[in-house]
Amino acid sequence: MEESILNAHNKEEYPPMHTAEHILNQTMVRMFGCPRSRNAHIERKKSKCDYLLDACPSEEQVQEIERRVNEVIAQHLPVSYEFVKRGEVPPEVDLWKLPDDASETLRLVRIGDYDLCACVGTHVQNTSEIAPFKIISHDYIADTHTWRMRFKLAE
């Protein structure tokens, strides 16, 4: 394939947190059937993600999200990249957040057999590089069906 051209990325990310966010997104998709986060703010110390949900998850569900994310992290899955043309993206990859001016060549990030997502961000090479995941708070805005979760990685 010819040399790939990617859109410029506008921020420096903390790879363990960014990869944890991908695992969290796939966990939410699997547990609730919702889209990946509609809004995310990923930082080294703590991060947040917003999800469109019909109801606020119960405390048991919140604990289960945390447990499942940590279970995936503990599997020591490889993180790999592949470059594909937009028309060749597998159907399970959601492109709704892709900007209109995105290049024709996309980079897909694969976390073992757990997640596959178009992304230009930085990631770890293996989930063994991610510290345990902890949900630190969450709230639900009924008017917009938005569940906001704040999380961190153990230090």
Protein language model regions, located:
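Active-/binding-site microenvironments in catalytic and ligand-binding cores
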Residues: 1-155
